[in-house]
């Protein structure tokens, strides 16, 4: 049975909150990998984008970057084989955060070594000395933070960056000789990620989410919600039909987004913790579970 229009809109709001991190992560990936390899601040898929200075007020890729660590980022696609990340020995804080396609922190690499970042179902052999790290989604965002004491310390950070390696397992086992493929630049993929997502129609948004869920499976904890949302065709591989939304859908969609901005900001504030003059976001940050409004 098709639910009535009011029930549909309640589900649409729930589904939007649920899928927003997935769709926004994909838009961020599309922008960040939109390069032929020559653009500052971007790199093709499975390749490093090493920052050469600290983030400042002009930094726009993500909110609230650190200002005492230099970032080395890479967008990984491990759908066909694991990627090997080699983290060198360093004399300072340097760790790798692995974010999945839903913005959960799947793993943190904080010791020197070679790590094979793999999907749980991958069944190949790893060479000696390579540590397997299972992650839940084919799209992963690796964010490496290397601390520095000031601009005069930058050459030391560059030396660490040069020793980092990222290459497919098949290239690693053949001795590490690897020429990364050249990327491609498309003008239509030059956008501000959050603006791109907010400008999507209902069909664009939910069908993007449905396609992404096929390669970046939802967590087991999401099963109950997805069972409910299947009534409006939101879920891996489904096709969302905007006809469900009834008349005046475009206007109502705009109103819904405006309303969500206010309520989600208030909901997010509930997780804020004060420490003297500092504000930070507490649990379950990084492993959000079913706290979909966080």
Regions found by a protein language model. Give the residues of each.
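A compositional/structural signature for long, glycine/proline-rich flexible linkers
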Residues: 2-294
């Amino acid at each position: 049975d098709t639910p009535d229009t009011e029930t549909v809109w309640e589900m649409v709001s729930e589904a939007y909150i649920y899928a927003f991190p997935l769709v926004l992560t994909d838009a961020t990936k599309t922008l960040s990998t939109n390069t032929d390899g020559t653009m500052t601040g971007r790199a093709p898929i499975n390749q490093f984008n090493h920052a050469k200075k600290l983030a400042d007020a002009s930094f726009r890729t993500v909110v609230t970057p650190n200002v005492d660590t230099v970032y080395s980022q890479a967008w990984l696609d491990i759908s066909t084989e694991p990627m090997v990340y080699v983290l060198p020995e360093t004399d300072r804080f340097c760790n790798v955060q692995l974010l999945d396609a839903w913005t959960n922190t799947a793993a943190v690499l904080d010791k020197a070594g070679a790590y094979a970042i793999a999907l749980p179902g991958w069944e190949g052999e790893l060479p000696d000395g390579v540590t397997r790290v299972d992650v839940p989604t084919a799209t992963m965002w690796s964010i490496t933070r290397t601390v520095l004491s000031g601009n005069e310390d930058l050459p030391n950070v560059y030396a660490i960056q040069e020793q980092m390696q990222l290459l497919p397992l098949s290239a690693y086992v053949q001795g590490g000789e690897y020429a990364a493929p050249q990327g491609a630049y498309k003008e239509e993929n030059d956008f501000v990620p959050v603006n791109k997502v907010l400008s999507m129609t209902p069909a664009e948004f939910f069908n993007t989410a449905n396609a992404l869920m096929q390669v970046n499976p939802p967590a087991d904890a999401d099963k109950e919600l997805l069972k409910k949302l299947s009534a409006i065709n939101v879920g891996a591989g489904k096709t969302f039909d905007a006809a469900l939304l009834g008349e005046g859908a475009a206007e109502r969609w705009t109103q819904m987004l405006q309303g969500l901005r206010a309520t989600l900001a208030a909901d997010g504030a509930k997780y804020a913790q004060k420490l003297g003059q500092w504000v930070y976001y507490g649990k379950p940050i990084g492993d959000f579970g079913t706290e979909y409004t966080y």
